[in-house]
Amino acid sequence: MNLRKFLGGTVLVAFMLFSYSEQNQVNVLCSTDWFMVTVHPFLLNNDVYVHFYEVHLGLGCPPNHVHPHFYQFHYRVTECGIRIKAVSPDVVIYSSEIHYASKGSSTKYVIPVSCAAPRRSPWLTKPYSAKAPSNNMGATPKNDTSYHVFTLPEPSEQPNCSCPPYVYNQKSM
């Protein structure tokens, strides 16, 4: 029984290590406005460390966020020669390349990167009427730039709760 638990634990650890070593070395995110690529320093393999000054996006755009464990390119889709292709009325594909040129040798690589994004942002809602409600609750008084949303209780008023005494600056008895 103990041997079975040991072997099961060993297999689990081996699986976790294998999964960790197979991480994506390049991650791409995009929207209708932004194109973001994250590159890990061991981009090519685990033996070659890629310095941030050896990589660029598209037409020479350097990483604009450099961290010890990743470099990030975050540019508008209209910059760096990023290409745009509409594949349907609802989806657009953005594509570019990560260019690697080693400073210590003549090694060069081009890694294609692409991302699909919806044409319409899921964060934007449909237009709605800006008219105030009929009971005029949302209207502002004349010559006033703000309106009353809620009132805070007076300092002497305390809500009915079982809060600790220090919440209301009272001394405990």
Swiss-Prot record:
Organism: Mus musculus (Mouse)
Function: May play a role in placental development.
Signal peptide annotation: 1-23
GO cellular component: extracellular region
Keywords: Developmental protein, Secreted, Signal
Tissue-specific expression: Expressed in placenta.
Localisation per UniProt entry: Secreted
Chain segments annotated as coiled-coil in the UniProt record: none
Homology family: Belongs to the PLAC1 family.
InterPro entries for this protein: PLAC1_fam, ZP-N
Protein name: Placenta-specific protein 1
Gene3D superfamilies: Zona pellucida, ZP-N domain
Example GO BP: placenta development
